[in-house]
Every structure is written in structure tokens, then in C-alpha cells.
Amino acid sequence: MKVRSLLLTGMVFVILGFFAAISLSPAAAADEVFHWKWQAHQTAGSLPCETIIPRFIKRVEEMTGGRLKITLHYAGELVEYTEVFPALQANMIQIANTGALFWRGSVPVGWITAGNLPPFITRSDAEFNELYHHRGLDKLMGEAWAEQGIHFLGSHNVGDTYFWSKKPINSLEDLKGFKVRFFGAMSDTMEHFGASPIMLPHPEVYMAISTGTLDGAGTCWWQYRDLKHYEVCPYYIGPPWQVPQAMELLVSQKAWDALPRDIQAILETAAIVMSKEFADLNRIEEQEMYRESFPKWGTKFIQWSEGDVDRITKEFSLPYLDKIAAEVGPKDPRVVKGIEIIKQFMRDYGYID
């Protein structure tokens, strides 16, 4: 009887231990519902906010069985774009699509993000995908962001970078005195060739052009359509300076670490899908704009010569990369490594000697 009693007691402890293990197991923890805030870089009505990001949010909620719910907030609703980085670090917001170039002063790898590359580095979606996702640039940036308390979900294609104007800009020579809203290396390029670049949030640009504060603007092609810049800028200048422009998907490390591994894997997969989906929709809708909307709006497409493209590449873009390596490289060796990767890529494609 004593043996039987001991066996029964042991079985009770085993069963209790089993249920305790279940209650503490990842499977039980996985039942927790997480609520995230997404701060978008773009405004309501834009391609990302109306299509791309909502699809991401819906996909993640469905794939997690409702365990991760994300609420989208438009540009400036939670914090201004300049405050997204510290807000992520503090876990005030949990996820953001933004441009790391805005913090290139404090995070050196911001200088080698796709959004900050000078003109004519990559010249197709496939080239961008190769350079960032397969030649190691995203890996370098992920390491740097981790040191800042931010988890990096990769660079994503947001469409080609053009600029547009109230007056014809037929060549580089016409840039002198041109007051333009631009960003990062695009602003640096404009300044090099005599223009006067200004950085303004997207919602303020239309009025600035209307009142004469600006002569034009430059960014992703769809901003021309979605912000109705065609009403104030009838001249649209190509070829695109960045093919494509890209941004980064950043997550608060604190929020990331709180997630079960399966939800982390779902987010990683959803980020890859988002980049591909963004690239596809960009190509489809951009061509629709040229084919159907330009005639209706009265927009004139001005195509610069190959000579201008070659001059920008050799006179500005290549020296700019070397300057970044020399001046920013000592702050983070990943910047030097990144520039080496970029220049080798350009040699492989015959863009530089």
C-alpha cells in the first residue's frame, strides 16, 4: 500500500508539473494578443497608406490568428518624421516605414541606405534587390540598427525617384537657382549643380509650390499623383534618379523581443512580401499614370540626355561615395564595407570603370 501511495503521489506531481509546464510554455504564451502602433511616413490617400500597409497589417493579423493587431497612423499623427527613431527606441511606437537617411548624422549606416544613395547607382528593381538583399547591404544595416535598440526588417522598394517643376528643366544647366523640395543625396546632388534644395514634409509641399516658395519637388513618382502636384507642376523630369527609391521597415527591439518566435517569423515573411508587392504595384500604376493620366493632366515628360546621366554619375555620384567612405567611414567600418560593395556592384554592371 505504501508503495502504491508513493506511486500515486508521484503521478500527481508529474501531472501537476505537466500542466505547469504547459502554462509556462511558448504555446500558452502564444495565446497573448499584442497591439502595435505603426507610424507611416506617408499621408492618407497615398499608395502605401491606402494599399501596401493595410495589406501587410491584414496579412499579419490573419497569419497570426489575431494575435498581433497593428493600427496604422499616418505621417505626423503620433510623432513627426524626425522623432520616429527615438520613439521606436522608447517603444512609444512599435513599427514604422521610414527613411534611415533622416538619422544619418547619428547612425552612420544611414549614409548607405538606398534612400540616401546618389543618382544612378541601381537602375532596375532587380539590381536594387541584388545589391541590398543579396550582396550584404541589408545585413550591415541590420547589425547597426540592432546596436540602436531597433530591429531591422529590411529595405523595401517604394518606387522610382523623379522630380517635377513649374517650368521646363531641360538639362543640368537649367538647375541653377531652382528651388526644389528634395531629400538626402538627392538634395546634395541638386546643390552641387546649382539648385537650392529644401526639405519639407510632404503635406506642406503643394502650398509651397503654389505660393512660389518652391519651384518644384522630387520624391517617389506616386507623390506627384497622390498629392496632386500635377496641378502646380506641369513638367515631369526623367530619367529617374533612383531606381528605385527605398525605405526601411523598423521595429522597436523591445516590442520585437516580446513576441513569440512564430510571430517574428510571420513578420519577417510579410516584410519580404510587402517589398515585392510594392515593387509590382509601382510598375503597374506608374505606367498607368504615364499612359492615362499625363494626357488628362497636361503633364509634359522631359527626358534628360545620356550625357547628363553620365555627367551626374562621374562628377557627383562616384565622388560622393568616396567622400562618404572617407568622412563617415571612421565612425563605423560598416560604412566603408558598404561603399566597397556598392562600387563593386557598379563595376560589375559597367556603370563605372
Identify what each model region corresponds to.
Residues L24-A29:
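Sec/Tat signal peptide C-region and signal peptidase I cleavage site
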